[in-house]
C-alpha cells in the first residue's frame, strides 16, 4: 500500500492508494517534460498571489528564490522525480518545499488546481514545440527549393495514376512538394492563435474566489489572453487534437515526398542516386543502397496518424468538466513531436543530397506518348473543336503505337492522313522543350512560371520564419 506523503490530494483519505492504483496514476515518466514550464508558471503564480494580497513581499521573494533554485536544478538534471512522486506537479512541490520549507512552499498552491495548471503547461509546451517542428519543416522546404534552383530546365515525365502523363520540369515537381509543407507551417501559425489562450486561474473548473488576475498571469506567461470560460478552459483539449492533426498532416506530406524518392531511386526508374551519408546497405546483399530515411518517413506517418486518432478517441465521450482520461492526452502529442524532430533533419539532408539523372529523366519524358495533349491543344489553337482535336490526337497515338514509334516520328503524310489540320507546324509542340514552354499559365510548368513559383516559395518561407519568431 502506498502512502499519501507528498500527494496533492491526501487529506480526505484515511490511507494511501493501492500499489496498483499508484502505478496506474503515475505520469512522471512522460509529464516531466512539462517541468520547466511548471516552474515558470509557478513564478508567475507567486507574483499574482502577491498582487492579490495573499503573500507578503517577503514570502513572494522567498518563493521566487526557491523557484529559481529549483529551475536551475531541473535544468542541469540534479533534481528529478522520485518513484513516490505521482506527477510533475507533486515532484516540483516537493522540490520547492525542500528549499523553502512546508509553510512557505505550501502557500503556492492557493488558487490553482492541477486542472488549470496542466492545461496551461500543455499549451505552453506545445507553443514552443510547434515552433521547433515548423523550423524543421521549413528546412525541408529550403532543401526542395535549392534542388529546384539547381535544376531550372531539367525535364521529367509528369505522372498521374503513376502513368506517364505530360512532360514537366523537375523543379515544378519538387516545388509541388514544398507548397503542402508550407501550408502545414501556416496551420501552425494559425494554431498558435488558439493555443495562446491561458486557462490559468480557472481552478478545478469554476474559477477562483481569491481575487486572482487571470489576464495578468496570461500576459506574464506569454499568452495573448485568458480563457473566457473556466469549464471549457480546464476540460477542452481541442488544441492538442489540432496540433496532433497538423503533426499527422506534416507526416503525410513527408510520406508522399518519401514515396517519390523511394520510387525514383529504384533501378527501374533510376531518376536519382542516394548519397552514401543518407542511405544504408544490406547485411547480405553488398550491392544495395537503401532509402531508409524515406522508408522511415513513410512508416512514421502511420504512427502519427495513430497518435491523432487515439487522442480523438480519448476525447470523444468525456462529460464536462475535467476527467482523468485527460492524462492520456499528452503522450501521443509528445511522441509526434519527438518523431518529427528526428525525421525532419534527416529528410532535409536526404533531399538536399539527391543526385538527379537529368538525362535519363529527359529521355523518358516523351515515353508513353506524353505529347498527345500538346497535339490536341495545338489543334484547338488552330480553331479545331476540342472533341475533334482529342480524337485526332488519340488517332495519332494509335498510329504511332502500331508502328512502335514516337509521335514525333510520324511522317507528314501520316499526320495529314489522320487529320488535314495536322500540318507540319504541329512539330513545334512535338518536343518536350516545346511542351513545357507552352504551358505558361500561372502555376504552369513553363520555365518562367516555375522560376516565379520558386520565388514565391522562398518569399512564403521567409514570411513564415518571421511569424514564427513572434
Curated annotation (Swiss-Prot):
Transmembrane segments: none annotated. Coiled coil: none annotated. The keyword rRNA processing does not apply. Gene3D superfamilies: Fumarase/aspartase (C-terminal domain), Fumarase/aspartase (Central domain), Fumarase/aspartase (N-terminal domain). It is found in: Cytoplasm. It holds the Pfam family Lyase_1. GO terms for cellular component: cytosol. InterPro entries: Arg_succ_lyase_C, Argininosuccinate_lyase, Fumarase/histidase_N, Fumarate_lyase_CS, Fumarate_lyase_fam, Fumarate_lyase_N, L-Aspartase-like. It comes from the Bacteria. It is an enzyme of class 4 (lyase). It catalyses: 2-(N(omega)-L-arginino)succinate = fumarate + L-arginine. Keywords: Amino-acid biosynthesis, Arginine biosynthesis, Cytoplasm, Lyase. Pathway: Amino-acid biosynthesis; L-arginine biosynthesis; L-arginine from L-ornithine and carbamoyl phosphate: step 3/3. One of its GO terms (molecular function) is argininosuccinate lyase activity. Its EC number is 4.3.2.1. One of its GO terms (biological process) is L-arginine biosynthetic process. PANTHER family: ARGININOSUCCINATE LYASE. Belongs to the lyase 1 family. Argininosuccinate lyase subfamily. This is Argininosuccinate lyase. The gene is argH.
